[in-house]
Amino acid sequence: MKIKTRFAPSPTGYLHVGGARTALYSWLFARNHGGEFVLRIEDTDLERSTPEAIEAIMDGMNWLSLEWDEGPYYQTKRFDRYNAVIDQMLEEGTAYKCYCSKERLEALREEQMAKGEKPRYDGRCRHSHEHHADDEPCVVRFANPQEGSVVFDDQIRGPIEFSNQELDDLIIRRTDGSPTYNFCVVVDDWDMEITHVIRGEDHINNTPRQINILKALKAPVPVYAHVSMINGDDGKKLSKRHGAVSVMQYRDDGYLPEALLNYLVRLGWSHGDQEIFTREEMIKYFTLNAVSKSASAFNTDKLLWLNHHYINALPPEYVATHLQWHIEQENIDTRNGPQLADLVKLLGERCKTLKEMAQSCRYFYEDFAEFDADAAKKHLRPVARQPLEVVRDKLTAITDWTAENVHHAIQATADELEVGMGKVGMPLRVAVTGAGQSPALDVTVHAIGKTRSIERINKALAFIAERENQQ
């Protein structure tokens, strides 16, 4: 049997991390079994579904490289198929037309609630032999079995049972002729030959209804697995107040897709004590029986730690392809300065996100208008004039511009003036970067370049001279 899974989001908003984790688990399960992964857009909610949301879902899937083998299929393009199946069910007696008014249904609901009963349709039209005009408004209901129970073996939670007496005669076609969500899902899973449905636990109550419809259609019933929800670190359901929840927001905030994938796969699944997983390892080790039944807590600090790891562990050339977008957001012209891959090597240890890296690299490519006030006050004092002049001359004399030779020039300055390296290094750092912090000074000066570094030292000396004149 060929394994076939699907990810079926509703395009009413962005791709959130919960949906991304569900997509990842479905994708991994299919890849682990050499199967196929289907993308289906469940856009039957015509009022809330938007093209922008569909694009956002696609963007998120593509950014995470969760490639699909079939689709995307759109439910709105399959209405003829759904209605053909409903008409077939009406002929076979597994569905029936219901003419009950909204007023009657509301009165029935209030009566049942007053008695402490679970509100459900009483089956009046199921047993009615009244004649109705062809154009009289009606819905179509599924004739749910009235006895017995539905049992399915959830691959994460174990056996789950629902009594058929608890289930309603579900509306499968509205008065306007449009099929309903629960019915469309059933026909889609049947037509697309889905073998395993991996989805959120909020769908558990839909499962017995869908199984009963599948059985009425004499269609194969897929295997189900319901993933627990994701909570914030306060134990409450993850929402915007916990920070970013959109996949693309994490891209915008400077996270690598590898970091988010690694974090999401571990958010409810484990393989021993291993924390870091390549994509290939995820595929190799992923099993549904290792997925936890309990809700997971989203920990941004852990994600940040993983992101920092991947910034330094992945090839700099690859990280640079993702950094490029953030550089463009900052409007930095990188034509005159180090290659982005070299920048990743320079700033990787200091920066936990690519956004932070892009925001702290401008001095490598563009001259700054002024020095950081605190850093200049502390380090660009008259006492720094001589160290800066000497190190400038030694840097000017370098014919082979390497980080090693830059280091020798700084060391030689300290030795000549018989001062510690900090007495040379800190004024030089502020002079060439405009700030009091940077990566190692020798590689920083080397990356900034000889001409630009010397120009900035002269600018710092002019700043010191002006400061002396004001005293």
From Swiss-Prot:
Give the matching HAMAP family: Glu_tRNA_synth_type1
What is this protein's name?
Glutamate--tRNA ligase
**UniProt similarity note:** Belongs to the class-I aminoacyl-tRNA synthetase family. Glutamate--tRNA ligase type 1 subfamily.
For the ligand (Zn(2+)), the binding residues are C98, C100, C125, H127
Disulfide linkages recorded for this protein, renumbered to the chain, are none
Spell out the subcellular localization from the entry.
Cytoplasm
Q: What class of enzyme is it?
A: ligase
User: Source species, please?
Assistant: Escherichia coli O6:H1 (strain CFT073 / ATCC 700928 / UPEC)
Q: Which cofactor does it need?
A: Zn(2+)
User: EC number(s)?
Assistant: 6.1.1.17
Q: Name one GO molecular function term.
A: zinc ion binding
Q: Tell me the subunit arrangement.
A: Monomer.
